[in-house]
């Protein structure tokens, strides 16, 4: 099934930002879809996450090609597909990034393990999207399944994944 990309008005949920250390070798941004928050906190968190996401995209690809594709595809490279899940007990991984120099050291796995443990303890599904096909198998190793793939006339695909509560 392919997720739809209709832009519906979305609720505001509690967002959390985690890092492996003060050096920010990795960051994980999650949204607890079961917990609503106030708008001021939401905009502060969103702004912080956007700035750091953009910084990671630029750092990972100095040619700015990936960053340019994200700007260009912003109207459909988003999480609106999660509306189809009809699941309020859900964590959504908004962003997971590891500094390229620190990759392959288990940092992402540690952050994911902690997220999965939290979700299991709270009987929650986890959803996420990735734009890197190589990441799909990585997430499958943690029990995620491809829910759908968003494609347009555009060189970037969005792989939508879920991990059911088990």
Q: What residue ranges belong to the model's regions?
A:
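Conserved active-site alpha-helix within GNAT-family acetyltransferase domains
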Residues: 109, 121-122, 132-149, 153-155
């Amino acid at each position: 099934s392919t997720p739809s990309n209709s832009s519906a008005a979305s609720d505001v949920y509690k967002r959390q930002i985690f890092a492996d250390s003060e050096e920010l070798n990795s960051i994980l941004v999650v949204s607890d879809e079961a917990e609503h928050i106030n708008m001021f906190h939401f905009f502060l968190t969103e702004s912080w996450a956007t700035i750091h996401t953009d910084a990671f995209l630029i750092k990972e690809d100095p040619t700015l090609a990936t960053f340019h594709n994200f700007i260009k595809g912003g109207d459909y490279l988003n999480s609106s597909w999660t509306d189809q899940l009809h699941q309020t007990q859900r964590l959504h991984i908004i962003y997971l990034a590891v500094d390229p120099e620190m990759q392959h050291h288990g940092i992402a796995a540690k952050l994911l393990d902690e997220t999965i443990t939290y979700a299991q303890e709270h009987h929650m599904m986890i959803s996420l999207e990735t734009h890197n096909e190589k990441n799909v198998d990585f997430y499958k190793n943690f029990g995620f399944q491809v829910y759908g793939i968003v494609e347009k006339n555009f060189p970037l695909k969005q792989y939508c994944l879920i991990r059911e509560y088990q």
